Swiss-Prot record:
Gene name in the database record: azoR1
Molecular-function GO terms, alphabetical: electron transfer activity; FMN binding; oxidoreductase activity, acting on NAD(P)H as acceptor; oxidoreductase activity, acting on NAD(P)H, quinone or similar compound as acceptor
Protein name: FMN-dependent NADH:quinone oxidoreductase 1
Superkingdom classification of source: Bacteria
Record's keyword terms, sorted: Flavoprotein, FMN, NAD, Oxidoreductase
Short name of one Pfam family: Flavodoxin_2
Catalytic activity, reaction form: 2 a quinone + NADH + H(+) = 2 a 1,4-benzosemiquinone + NAD(+); N,N-dimethyl-1,4-phenylenediamine + anthranilate + 2 NAD(+) = 2-(4-dimethylaminophenyl)diazenylbenzoate + 2 NADH + 2 H(+)
Role this protein plays: Quinone reductase that provides resistance to thiol-specific stress caused by electrophilic quinones. Also exhibits azoreductase activity. Catalyzes the reductive cleavage of the azo bond in aromatic azo compounds to the corresponding amines.
Entry annotated with the keyword NAD: yes
Names of the cofactor(s): FMN
Amino acid sequence: MSQPITRILKIDSSARAESSMSRKLAQQLTEQLIAANPGAEVVSRDVSGGLPFVTEEWIGASYTPADQRTEAQNQALALSDSLIEEVQAADTLVIAVPMYNFSVPATLKAYIDQICRAQVTFRYTEQGPVGLLENKKAYVVTVTGGTPVNSAADFVSAYMRQVLGFIGIKDVTFINADRIMVDPESILADAQQQIAAATEVAAA
């Protein structure tokens, strides 16, 4: 039996607002997860407006022990700390990812760089990196205009699975609305069926 969902972190990254299909599908998925888990809290994070890129100061601060950081270093990591706290507090992530030129939006990549922190969301071992954000579920809603998901040109799916696993989130379900420009009506209907199936499993 699935564990009840208590807090959902919904992450949007599309540059589009009202017309964004990834936003609409992610919202539908979130609403159905809430319906299956009454009382679940939702925290929304829209990264489309852009986040700071990682800088030399950020890197230096992140590798400095917390009790040895200067005030400037603490300020350099303040946003990263806040974003990581949101992820740590959630048991479920819903990530809306439109494909831009075969990959994820630059704003989403900037967000991911902010939350991938050594000794915070992953640690190095002799056997390789180990993720520290365990016991979480992620749903990745991907939308492409004309590129088939899991094709050689799809650099979204493998990347999202890899980076989520890197920080410890290995239970990942993809909701795919690929080639939406080819047949929008049928592709949307199929994505909604995927959402229904995923939320049915979550409620089981």
